[in-house]
Every structure is written in structure tokens, then in C-alpha cells.
Amino acid sequence: MTRGLRNNNPLNIRHSADQWQGVATTQTDKSFVQFQSMAYGYRAVWKILDTYRLRFRRERLPYHVRNIITRWAPPSENDTEAYIRHVVRLSGLGGYENIPRPSRYRNFERLKKTARLIAAMTCVENGISMKEVDMEAIWKGYDLAWPGRRVPEEVEEVPVLEDVSVWDEYWDWSAFASNWD
């Protein structure tokens, strides 16, 4: 099991001054936050992405997949271009496709774009397939972030791309070996 999944922190959020809800009582990982449940890990992701939207607006940057991932996984620490390619491939979103601000959604179809982005980023961060992503936990994370904003009947599985073998031609998985048992 990967470090992110073991920590209930699917996108590997690092320790910081942020006071997250649902943090596990015992923090044994020196680098990454450990959450009580995967839903709380996803809650933090939704909140971070909402904050990105505000920052991008102030900086007059478009809020699209490429900019989000470049901020999340900067080139100084990651192969950002490979990360973007994989997220685009897995999510079915375009690299320059605008993503709606999570806290201000008016249309569930648009909000599903953000859920697909989060699911694809979970795959890249943890080396898993879209089939293995817990979409229910992603939506529970949204509900924890903004209670009462989403109608429960709206939960829907994100389409899964079957052929993920293309990852290997672009991605050097050995760089992530330290995150795995």
C-alpha cells in the first residue's frame, strides 16, 4: 500500500501550519499529514483546490488543469509535464480546460470535472488505476468541506479509462519507490 493511501492522504499533503479537520491523533509520518479517514484527506484536497482558484484569480491566471498541477507538483520537485499528461489522459479533461471553483458550483456536471481531476491526481500520486479510486470518499470529502451544498442522489461514478498501460511509456515509476512498501 502506498504512503498516501496508508495515511488517508491521497494527494500527499505535507505538514504545514494549516489546521486540517479530521487529522489523525497520532502523526507518525514526519513529512505528510495523516487523516482519520480518506474522506477527510479528500476534504483537504477540495479546500486546497478552492484556495488555488482564489489565488489564480488574484494573479490573473486561468484555473485550468495545467496551472493547477503545476502549482500542486512544481517542476522543482516533480516531472510536472508527465504528471499533467497522465492526469489529462486519465481524467479525460483537456490540459487547458477550465475547472469550476468547488465552493461555488451551480451545476453538478461541472463539479464532476473537479472530481475527475482529483481522481486522476490520486492515481498519479499513488500509482493506482481509476478503478481503484474511491469516488464515494471523494464526494464525502466534498460534503465535509461544504455541508449541504450537494444533493446526495447526484453521486455518480467517474468514467474509467481501461487502458492505463500508456503510463509506463511516459512515467518513471522508480522515482516514487520511496512512497511504497
Question: What residue spans do the PLM features occupy?
Answer:
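Cell-wall polysaccharide-cleaving catalytic domain and substrate-binding groove, primarily
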Residues: 1-181
